């Protein structure tokens, strides 16, 4: 079980496709701000467009994710990515349009391809042996860390160096190119056929996995608050705000390193236990970043926090695979994506509110407390769910034994008898 198990032409094609579909997502919020910043009230409008984009993602991920059919996976992903490419192109071609029109394009750009993340992750795990799923998810995490590290630099360079519309036109081109990549990959990800179906509605199955979503949202909520309040924290410490960029880049590098390290070996303990350990460690490092006075210490703490966050994210994705039947995994990833997006949106509001009444360091510590609370809630939910499942299984076994006994006593009786039903 090493990274050699995932080294294949299909995984390489998947990686290129994933970059094409995910880089526009990473570019979008900042690109929307640059698109309209020269208008009167441009920054306010840019923030509103970015919010419309995020709202589209949060709504679209669960709505479209629940409609993902493993047997027709490629068709669904192509339609979503095509819609996203058209919306991004509309923003780039019509930068001077009425704000309502731009808002509609922004919302559509977030909504249409929002299920692609879950679908592509499920497709990736279908391309590798079952024993190498953790390594595949580690590779995905490393890849996405790189995408999120490069995207802001690319947006700023293109918008300021060429034209504000160029990042959005590039986003449209990348998303369209990812559609071409999908045609080189399997059309479906239910390679073993439909199994694990119980007749229970997909919605109920997905709701049952709520503890995993809560813990997943907690991981990004915690680091999201640290990211958003970092410039204010540096000002509080008397450190140049310009250091925030390199520090956040270090956080992204730490996340990539953490993902690589996670895939190097099999880790002991249950998935939920590992998740709690990663979350508590990450919380400790974020708290240290809030308390350490020097820039070097803050940078190291954030990098180590990012390293542990990667482990927490991969563990949550593995937990989702363990919790859901195969036919609902892609939808589960999409719901997780929406939960994380909602958590990040709430984090932004929380950061803005807290910074008006408390010091930045206190705001970060409040975020740590919230993250630990959500982690505890998710852990409790998983323990409770497992206990219920065991109780149900025990009751079912008892019923089977009773039925078997009745059947033995009624041997030779008509089929209509209860023992033979």
What are these regions (language model features)?
Residues 32, 114-128, 230, 311-324:
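Intracellular juxtamembrane helix-capping segments at the cytosolic ends
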Residues 59-73, 159, 257-271, 355:
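Helix-to-loop junctions at the C-terminal end of transmembrane segments
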Residues 82-97, 281-293:
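C-terminal ends and interior cores of transmembrane alpha-helices
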Residues 272-313:
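C-terminal transmembrane helical hairpin of 12-TM major facilitator-type secondary transporters
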Residues 327-358:
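A late C-terminal transmembrane helix in Major Facilitator Superfamily
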């Amino acid at each position: 079980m090493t990274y050699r198990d995932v080294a294949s032409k299909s995984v390489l094609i998947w990686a290129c496709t994933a970059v094409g579909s995910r880089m526009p997502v990473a570019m979008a919020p900042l690109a929307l701000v640059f698109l309209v910043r020269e208008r009167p009230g441009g920054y306010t409008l840019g923030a509103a467009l970015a919010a419309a984009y995020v709202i589209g993602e949060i709504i679209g991920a669960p709505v479209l994710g629940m409609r993902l059919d493993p047997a027709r996976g490629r068709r669904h992903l192509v339609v979503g990515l095509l819609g996203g490419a058209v919306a991004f192109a509309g923003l780039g071609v019509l930068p001077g349009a009425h704000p309502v029109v731009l808002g509609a394009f922004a919302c559509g750009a977030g909504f249409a391809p929002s299920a692609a993340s879950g679908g592509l992750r499920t497709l990736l795990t279908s391309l590798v042996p079952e024993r190498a799923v953790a390594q595949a998810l580690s590779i995905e995490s490393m890849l996405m860390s790189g995408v999120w590290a490069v995207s802001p630099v690319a947006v700023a360079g293109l918008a300021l160096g060429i034209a504000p519309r160029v990042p959005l036109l590039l986003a449209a081109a990348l998303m369209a190119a990812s559609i071409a990549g999908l045609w080189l990959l399997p059309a479906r990800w239910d390679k073993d056929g439909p199994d694990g179906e119980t007749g229970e509605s997909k919605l109920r199955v997905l709701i049952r996995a709520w503890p995993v979503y809560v813990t997943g949202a907690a991981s990004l909520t915690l680091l999201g608050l640290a990211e958003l309040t970092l410039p204010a924290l540096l000002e509080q410490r008397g450190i140049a705000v310009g250091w925030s960029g390199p520090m956040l880049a270090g956080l992204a590098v730490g996340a990539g390193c953490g993902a690589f390290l996670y895939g190097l070996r099999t880790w002991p303990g249950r998935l939920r236990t590992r998740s709690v350990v990663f979350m508590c460690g990450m919380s400790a490092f974020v708290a240290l970043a809030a308390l350490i006075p020097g820039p070097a210490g803050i940078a190291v703490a954030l990098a180590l926090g990012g390293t542990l966050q990667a482990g927490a994210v991969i563990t949550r994705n593995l937990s989702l695979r363990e919790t859901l039947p195969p036919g609902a995994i892609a939808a589960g990833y999409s719901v997780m994506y929406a939960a994380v997006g909602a958590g990040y949106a709430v984090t932004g509001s929380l950061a803005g509110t807290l910074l008006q009444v408390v010091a930045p360091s206190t705001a970060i510590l409040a975020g740590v407390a919230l993250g630990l609370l959500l982690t505890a809630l998710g852990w409790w939910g998983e323990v409770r769910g497992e206990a219920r499942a065991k109780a149900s299984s025990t009751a079912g076994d008892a019923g089977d034994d009773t039925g078997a006994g009745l059947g033995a006593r009624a041997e030779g009786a008509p089929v209509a008898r209860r023992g033979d039903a």
